Regions:
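Extended intrinsically disordered terminal tails
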Residues: 1-148
Length: 148
């Protein structure tokens, strides 16, 4: 009797790793979108603060724009908390977001391919097991030999 041993090489760790990578990418995307929003708001506030230098009465200008000054300070602190000391351009942030979205899409596609392969391997394994069970039944109950 020939015995065939098949090795099914699907690695469930790969599926889990893909899930972890997708979660990491989602987190990074969320962070980058917050940074983008903060940077855009910071630029607007920064313009108001720079305009104070050319205002005829800087003290009155500052009191009229106190909200922008407070927002500027809080945005500056938040951006520093993200490790940003130099404000990146909008294009640079958007490119980073686009790259993350592309990487996430690619990872999702890879995960779907892994799942398809796993399904195929499961079917092959079931068929192989059924075939072995059929052969074992046939071997344990041999057909009676015909006599002449």
């Amino acid at each position: 009797m020939n015995v065939f041993i098949f090795s099914f090489n699907f690695n469930p760790v790969s599926d889990k790793a893909a899930d972890q990578k997708i979660a990491q990418l989602n987190s990074e995307l969320s962070t980058q979108k917050i940074i983008q929003k903060h940077c855009d708001s910071y630029r607007l506030c920064r313009k108001v603060i720079e305009d104070a230098k050319s205002a005829p009465n800087p003290t009155a200008y500052r009191s009229r724009h106190q909200a922008e000054y407070q927002l500027h300070d809080s945005l500056k602190k938040e951006l520093q908390d993200f490790g940003i000391t130099k404000i990146p351009s909008s294009e640079k942030i958007q490119k980073r977001i686009d790259n993350l979205v592309s990487e996430k899409t690619s990872t999702i596609r890879e995960k779907q391919e892994l799942r398809k392969k796993q399904l195929t391997l499961d079917i092959i394994q079931q068929n192989f097991s059924a075939l072995l069970n059929t052969q074992n039944i046939a071997l344990s109950h041999p057909l009676p030999e015909e006599t002449l």
